[in-house]
């Protein structure tokens, strides 16, 4: 009998939530075949069978929180239970009458045996088994509406209901009932996904544990847009990837971090860890909120290398295929609210990082060129949120001005590759 355990996923992850079982008790599974989907704080992970056999028992239901190393099921070796061998037929004609007379009680005996065996093999969720034990209910007698024939907790509750008072049933949904009583209009109570709960928790933690402050500036995007317009076809022919804005911003951020290294640091206890690498997180919209995959060693990548990496990570994020390693270890983050039409915002730090740059919508605005002349220019507000415990206002403003100057004269970025 092999145990199914929650594997170690990453240093920062100690637990997860079972999103769904992909196999049911009684199913035969091959080694390496997917068993279940586990939802963690960062990504969903599909766990596989470590050996072939029959999924014997599921100890944790979908929606249950499980710890790393916890046993959540078992797999029996081999191809499952085989039928008992048929009894050898007796050839003596004199015994045929005797066998005929014994047929009825024998059938009854086999039937009772089968019922007993069926009872012990009734497929049921752990919560259903627990409730059945507490109430003294025979699971083999409980009808279920599950298409796979699995007895669920609600099936046991429904089976028990006729013989008991309705009061216990009312206690089953205190949360939903409370929510409904809080409003005089119709509402819908939804359970937050594990990832959404984690996002909510961490955003509040950042506000409570850092001295977060935001400073703003604006960038004239004329030079970048003209450069893209002139070079986009040649760039695509040479690199088979489009030249976007993110590579310009990533290059500018790396250059600014080299000039202001405290924005590439983090606090650990009473020590300040200043990072000498440039792993830039790029916020990407996914179904359950933003995820921040990391572009590794962005200082060593060309414009094409950055665009390709961001494109691949964004595609994985949309398809929920990001690995934990692709989400960990960033030193600074860039987020682009402009893709959704945001004109200005104050991005929240991606802890333990101490800086995040917010990009916004490019909008034509009249700009004074000199005392007598105005021109409509494509302008973008940029925002830097930073941890004031480490970074002073002078450094924060200098960092943002450096990015502004580089983007308004992008030839400087091209000199860096």
From Swiss-Prot:
Catalytic reaction(s) noted: N(6)-[(R)-dihydrolipoyl]-L-lysyl-[protein] + succinyl-CoA = N(6)-[(R)-S(8)-succinyldihydrolipoyl]-L-lysyl-[protein] + CoA
Enzyme class per UniProt: transferase
Organism: Bacillus subtilis (strain 168)
Domain Lipoyl-binding: 1-76
Active site per UniProt: 388, 392
Cofactor(s), names only, from the UniProt record: (R)-lipoate
Region of interest (Disordered), ranges: 75-191
Phylogenetic classification of the source organism: Bacteria, Bacillati, Bacillota, Bacilli, Bacillales
Designated name of the protein: Dihydrolipoyllysine-residue succinyltransferase component of 2-oxoglutarate dehydrogenase complex
Its biological purpose: E2 component of the 2-oxoglutarate dehydrogenase (OGDH) complex which catalyzes the second step in the conversion of 2-oxoglutarate to succinyl-CoA and CO(2).
Chain intervals with Low complexity compositional bias: 164-182
Family of the protein in this entry: Belongs to the 2-oxoacid dehydrogenase family.
Residue positions, PTM N6-lipoyllysine: 42
Residue stretches making up the Peripheral subunit-binding (PSBD) domain: 123-160
Complex formation: Forms a 24-polypeptide structural core with octahedral symmetry. Part of the 2-oxoglutarate dehydrogenase (OGDH) complex composed of E1 (2-oxoglutarate dehydrogenase), E2 (dihydrolipoamide succinyltransferase) and E3 (dihydrolipoamide dehydrogenase); the complex contains multiple copies of the three enzymatic components (E1, E2 and E3).
Pathway: Amino-acid degradation; L-lysine degradation via saccharopine pathway; glutaryl-CoA from L-lysine: step 6/6
Cross-referenced NCBIfam families: PRK05704.1, sucB
């Amino acid at each position: 009998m092999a145990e199914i355990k929650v594997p170690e996923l990453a240093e920062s992850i100690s637990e997860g939530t079972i999103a769904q079982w992909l196999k049911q008790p009684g199913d035969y599974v091959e080694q390496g075949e997917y068993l279940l989907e586990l939802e963690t704080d960062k990504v969903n992970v599909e766990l596989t069978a470590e050996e072939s056999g029959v999924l014997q028992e599921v100890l944790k239901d979908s929606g249950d929180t499980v710890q790393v190393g916890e046993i959540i099921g078992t797999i029996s070796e081999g191809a499952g239970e085989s039928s008992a061998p048929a009894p050898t037929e007796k050839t003596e004609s004199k015994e045929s009458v005797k066998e005929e007379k014994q047929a009825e009680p024998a059938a009854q005996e086999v039937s009772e045996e089968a019922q007993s065996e069926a009872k012990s093999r009734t497929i049921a969720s752990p919560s259903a088994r627990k409730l059945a034990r507490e109430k003294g209910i025979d699971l083999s007698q409980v009808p279920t509406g599950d298409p796979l024939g699995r007895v669920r907790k609600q099936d046991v509750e429904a089976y028990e209901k006729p013989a008991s008072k309705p009061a216990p049933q009312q206690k089953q949904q205190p949360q939903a009932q409370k929510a409904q009583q809080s409003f005089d209009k119709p509402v819908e109570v939804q359970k937050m996904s594990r990832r959404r709960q984690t996002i909510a928790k961490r955003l509040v933690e950042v506000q409570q544990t850092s001295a977060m402050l935001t400073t703003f500036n604006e960038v004239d995007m004329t030079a970048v847009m003209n450069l893209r317009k002139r070079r986009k076809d040649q760039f695509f022919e040479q690199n088979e990837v489009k030249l976007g804005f993110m590579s310009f911003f990533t290059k500018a951020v790396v250059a600014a971090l080299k000039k202001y290294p405290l924005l590439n640091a983090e606090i650990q206890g009473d020590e300040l860890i200043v990072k000498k690498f440039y792993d830039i997180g790029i916020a990407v919209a996914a179904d359950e909120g933003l995820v921040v995959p990391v572009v590794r060693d962005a200082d060593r990548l060309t414009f094409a290398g950055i665009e390709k990496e961001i494109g691949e990570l964004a595609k994985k994020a949309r398809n929920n295929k990001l690995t934990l390693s692709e989400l960990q270890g960033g030193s600074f983050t860039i987020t682009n609210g402009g893709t959704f039409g945001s004109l200005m915002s104050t991005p929240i730090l991606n802890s333990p990082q101490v800086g995040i740059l917010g990009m916004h919508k490019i909008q034509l605005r009249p700009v004074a060129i000199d005392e007598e002349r105005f021109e409509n220019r494509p302008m973008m507000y940029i925002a830097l949120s930073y941890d004031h415990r480490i970074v002073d206002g002078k450094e924060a403003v200098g960092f943002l001005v450096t990015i502004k100057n580089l983007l308004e004269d992008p030839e400087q970025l091209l000199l860096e590759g």
